[in-house]
Every structure is written in C-alpha cells, then in structure tokens.
Amino acid sequence: MAENFSWLHRGIAEVFPQPTDAESDIESLEKRLATTDRPLRVKYGIDPTGADIHLGHSIPMRKLRGFQDAGHTAVLIIGDFTARIGDPTGKSEMRRQLTEEDVKQNAQTYLDQVRPILDFDTPGRLEVRYNSEWLSRLDLGKITELLATMTVGQMLAKEGFADRYKKENPIFLHEFLYPLMQGYDSVAIEADVELGGTDQKFNIAVGRDLQRHFGQKPQFGVLLPILIGTDGVQKMSKSLGNYVSLSEHPGQKYQKLQGVPDVLLKDYFELLTNLPIDALPENPRDRQMLLAWEIVKQYHGEQAANEAKEAAQSGGKEGAVPEFSLSNVSQFPVKLAYLLGATGLCKSTGEGKRKIQEGGVRLDGDRISDADTTFQQPDELQGRVLQVGKNKFMRLVP
C-alpha cells in the first residue's frame, strides 16, 4: 500500500528538486521518505534576532513536528552566530548587529515558546544545535573556501541584494557571508531536508551546492508560505502590528484571531491547525471563533481556550486581561521594578528588579533586561501589557 504523505503536502508552497517524468533518475522527497532505512535529518534554522515568535514563524515549526511524528529527526538550529550578522533577505538596508547577550536571551525565549509545537521528549526526535558550534571555529582558509564556491554575480542575483545594488544602497561584504553560513549549517549537521519560507529558496539552494562541494548528498528544500497578517494585506510582522505572538495572553490571542478576515481563514486553518478543511463550519463567524479557540488551545490548553471564548462572548475587554490604573501611581518618573510591585505582578520592587534581571519581564511582548528601566509619563505606558513569567499579565490603563 502506498504511504500517505498528506501530512507532508498540507500547506507547502514547493518541494525542490521535484523531478519531472523525464528526470526519473532524480529521487523525489516522497521516495526518499518511503525507502530510507534511517530517520532523515530535517533542518530548520531560526535566528534569535528578537524576543518573540509569532504565528508566521510557527508554520515551519509545525511542519518540523510533522517530520518528527513520521519518525524523523528534527534538527532545530539556533543561529546564535548568524544572528549577529542578520539575514539580508528582503531587507533594503543592513540589519543592526546584535550583541552576544541579546542573542543569548532571545535564544532562550525562542525555545520556551516552541515547546508546545515540537516533540522535546521522544528520544532521537529532536536535536537543538547552535551554529556557533561550527561557525565560530572557521578559520580564514575555510572561509576563503566557502567564498570561492560562489560569484559576486550569483550573490547580486539574490532579490534583496539586487534591489539594494540597483538603488545604490550599500551592501557590506560580511552580508555576503550569510547565505554561505546558513548553507554551511547544512553541511555541519548533514541535513537531508531543510525547511524555510518561500523567501529562503536562495539560501537553501546554497546549502545544496555546499553539500555537493563537501561530498555530501544534497538536501531537499521544503518551502512554506509566508503568512499574511491579521490586517489581511501584508505579511505578519511585529513592526506592522498585524501579528499574533506565541507569548501573548490567551485572551489577546483569541481576540486577534476571531477578527481574521474571511478571505484568510482557509489559509490560517491549513497552515496553523490540523483540522480537516472540508469539515469547517459554513458560517464565516463560526469559522473565526473555531480558529481562535483551536489556536489558543494549542498553546495554552482547552481550559484557557474555553475561558478566552467565554470572556470574548461576554464582552470581556481583550479577553479579560486584568487591568491596573496608572492613576494609582503617585508620581512620575516611575521605575518598571516599582510598577511590578504596585500592580501585584511581583511581591515587591526588589522582586520586580530580580525578575527583570532574570529575563522574566516583558512589555507588549518585548523582554526588558535593564532593571533601571524608567518611564517619564503615564502616556508611555497606557494600553500596554506587562507580563511576568508565562502566566501573569496586567494591562495598564489611565
């Protein structure tokens, strides 16, 4: 009986190489999966360039879980080295370089957020690797060898570089290293498959070329769609405000998701859930509510999903996130550590300071690491959500 690969094909944009009938000598990914005598090594890399992961980032993670459930080994690469360069893909200017401490903090919060998605428990199903393990050891000779595998013309054909070159915006030489370093990750972990968004095809193809260069069998590329944000127009992005963060309060998640435009619902169900598409409710409003409930359940459990639904149906503001009035603060400027004690999120200002230093405090999803963070005026805080740990939230209101 032919193996069912519906889990593989759901919600993907492209698998490459994909042999045609005239290329019967080229192996397909389905054939490799069906005939392999060992678990395939399936790579997904993520650079910890910020504190948050949103639902758009979860799409390749969910596909990675699909490979795990099929018996293969997910190799999650934390790009602690490449994050300090920054992926130039789709960027019109050079990215700010991060400090080692920035990257370390972000990496830990990424792992915390993906635990509900990936199988961390079954032996042999997950490797978490940091690419500084091998990239930090490259000497000038090896770097020269990597650079010699590509031409400047090939690099300038990459969309982001091509646009910047045309507009005479600067392109720095270290940025040319990024695709080569991502590609070398595939060599270092001997990847059989690499997952990425549709914007990563160039980088994944570089990995295939480098594997050939180093005598390895080239990996397959599995490209996944870029998720459109809750505005229904542009790709999901924190900077555009059209995102749903994995670390958000269940009520906030529910509120945002029940407002997803009708035209996007099928894509959201296909990419973010395992529900059968042909069994969805006909009424768009019912589909929105089911989507919101299902995704909150995935990350917070059924009870939290039911509570968020009930709060939304009863008109609960932002899913009943508790509120604290800033009028209770006797004077400004005010330190964040004091505010944590005043809101009851921490027992005291001292505990608030310790929580900040430990990396356990967020404001609107952004990790705060400076214990002396101070706010000059109430309007800097109005409407924002303070978070301590995973489950304590407080909305700041006038």
Curated annotation (Swiss-Prot):
SUPFAM superfamilies: Alpha-L RNA-binding motif (SSF55174), Nucleotidylyl transferase (SSF52374). GO terms for cellular component: cytosol. Transmembrane segments: none annotated. ATP binds at K238. The keyword Ligase applies. It catalyses: tRNA(Tyr) + L-tyrosine + ATP = L-tyrosyl-tRNA(Tyr) + AMP + diphosphate + H(+). The keyword ATP-binding applies. Homodimer. Catalyzes the attachment of tyrosine to tRNA(Tyr) in a two-step reaction: tyrosine is first activated by ATP to form Tyr-AMP and then transferred to the acceptor end of tRNA(Tyr). This is Tyrosine--tRNA ligase.
